[in-house]
């Protein structure tokens, strides 16, 4: 008996087994057509974990480095052991350490949560554990077993984690594997509990263990290690190219799957102290600020209102959300006129982020907007990069819309 998702309609067959009546429209969907929906399901469930971890981590950094004025090169534990803090300040520092530890744990669950819900979206709740295990192994891979012929001893070594690449691959493969096994392994009704609580979980866990150890971790780790080696070897040029790529990927879909993938790459490099997260954090806030600014300056520059009436209040909302680190406020502009909005905020994000990185702005803390600004090195340059990118975005979108309006390709409802 196959365990079906709740959304399926179940009818009893002649043998007493249940068969799902497939939605005709869903049956026409190809693998590639369904895949983005499954990935977005994982991303949407992962985001709260990232937010919780990020905000709690931000509290720890703000308390330690802004309020208590600990030097940036000193860790919180070192500050605790320095003997320089007592009374209320010591209590604050202990709370900062707790927040840092707890926030770090929450961040560590982001990728496993993503993988678990992608697998769940594909194969139902039976695939959830396999996805979670695979996601956890992508961030905390199993030690490699090696034989050293010089000492005639076995030893272990730590592989390079496959991170987001590995989590994405294993969640998809595990989801479809569990879905296939659930459909193909038919047992009598009285063995249903055995199938769901023992057989499928054990088989899927063994598969995840072998696939991650022998295939996915080596492959994903090789890609991640290669990228890091190239960027590190390239020095300043590599850092600027990385900034441009991360900024473009961050801005292109405003919180969508490409944005989230860029976030995992950036967070991975930042966590390992390979490259800072500066470009990504700047690119998050430039699109909504720039598009909001465009709704303020369009009439002053052109003498015309170039946006539909409902976009003007949304522009102000987008600017406010940008200071909270939320780029989705720019989505209405991208939906209303993608040909003018998307190129404008991508160019603005790339130029502003790259300029800030080139001029020496550095942010290691993996958050954006006001949550991280107190911890930025060269904050003036950092803010100048945001301003530059926002102005470029605003000017580009205004003049692109003006050109389209004059050519009759843009209709504006000014009511």
Swiss-Prot record:
Query: What is one Gene Ontology biological process annotated in the Swiss-Prot or TrEMBL record?
Result: phosphoenolpyruvate-dependent sugar phosphotransferase system
The cellular component terms of Gene Ontology attached to this UniProt record, alphabetical and capped at eight, are: plasma membrane
Q: What is this protein called?
A: Fructose-like permease IIC component
Gene Ontology MF, one: protein-phosphocysteine-sugar phosphotransferase activity
> What is the annotated localization of this protein?
Cell inner membrane
Purpose of the protein: The phosphoenolpyruvate-dependent sugar phosphotransferase system (PTS), a major carbohydrate active -transport system, catalyzes the phosphorylation of incoming sugar substrates concomitant with their translocation across the cell membrane.
Q: Any stretches that span the bilayer, and where are they?
A: 47-67, 102-122, 127-147, 158-178, 198-218, 238-258, 277-297, 319-339, 342-362, 379-399
As for membrane topology, the entry says: Multi-pass membrane protein
Relay the domain remarks.
Answer: The EIIC domain forms the PTS system translocation channel and contains the specific substrate-binding site.
Source organism (scientific name) = Escherichia coli O157:H7
């Amino acid at each position: 008996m196959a365990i079906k998702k709740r959304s399926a309609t179940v009818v009893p067959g002649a043998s007493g087994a249940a068969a799902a009546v497939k939605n005709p429209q869903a049956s026409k969907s190809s693998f590639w057509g369904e895949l983005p929906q499954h990935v977005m399901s994982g991303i949407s469930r992962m985001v709260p974990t990232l937010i919780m971890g990020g905000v709690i981590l931000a509290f720890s950094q703000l308390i330690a480095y802004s309020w208590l004025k600990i030097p940036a090169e000193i860790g919180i534990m070192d500050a605790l052991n320095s003997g320089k803090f007592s009374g209320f300040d010591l209590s604050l520092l202990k709370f900062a350490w707790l927040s840092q530890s707890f926030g770090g744990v929450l961040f560590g669950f982001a990728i496993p949560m993503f993988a678990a819900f992608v697998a769940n979206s594909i194969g139902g709740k039976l695939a959830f554990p396999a996805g979670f295990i695979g996601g956890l192994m992508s961030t905390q891979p199993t030690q490699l077993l090696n034989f050293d012929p010089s000492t005639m001893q076995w030893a272990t070594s730590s592989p390079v984690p496959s991170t987001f690449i590995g989590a994405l691959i294993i969640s998809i493969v595990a989801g479809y594997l569990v879905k296939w096994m659930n459909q193909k392994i038919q047992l009598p009704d009285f063995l249903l509990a055995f199938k769901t609580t023992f057989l499928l979980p054990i088989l899927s866990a063994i598969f995840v263990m072998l696939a991650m150890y022998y295939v996915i971790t080596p492959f994903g780790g090789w890609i991640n290690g290669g990228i890091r080696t190239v960027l590190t070897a390239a020095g300043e040029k590599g850092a600027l190219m990385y900034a441009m790529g991360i900024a473009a990927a961050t801005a292109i879909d405003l919180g969508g799957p490409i944005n989230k993938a860029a976030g995992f790459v950036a967070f991975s490099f930042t966590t390992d102290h390979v490259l800072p997260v500066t470009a990504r954090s700047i690119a998050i806030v430039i699109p909504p600020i720039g598009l909001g600014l465009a709704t303020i300056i369009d009439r002053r520059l052109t003498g015309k209102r170039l946006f539909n009436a409902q976009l003007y209040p949304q522009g102000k909302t987008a600017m406010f959300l940008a200071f909270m680190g939320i780029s989705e406020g720019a989505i209405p502009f991208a939906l209303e006129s993608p040909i003018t909005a998307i190129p404008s905020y991508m160019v603005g994000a790339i130029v502003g982020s790259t300029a800030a990185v080139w001029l020496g702005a550095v942010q290691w803390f993996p958050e954006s907007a006001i949550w991280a600004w107190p911890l930025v090195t060269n904050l003036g340059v950092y803010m100048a990069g945001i301003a530059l990118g926002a102005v470029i975005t605003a000017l580009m979108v205004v003049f692109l819309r003006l050109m389209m309006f004059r050519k009759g390709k843009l209709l504006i409802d000014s009511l």
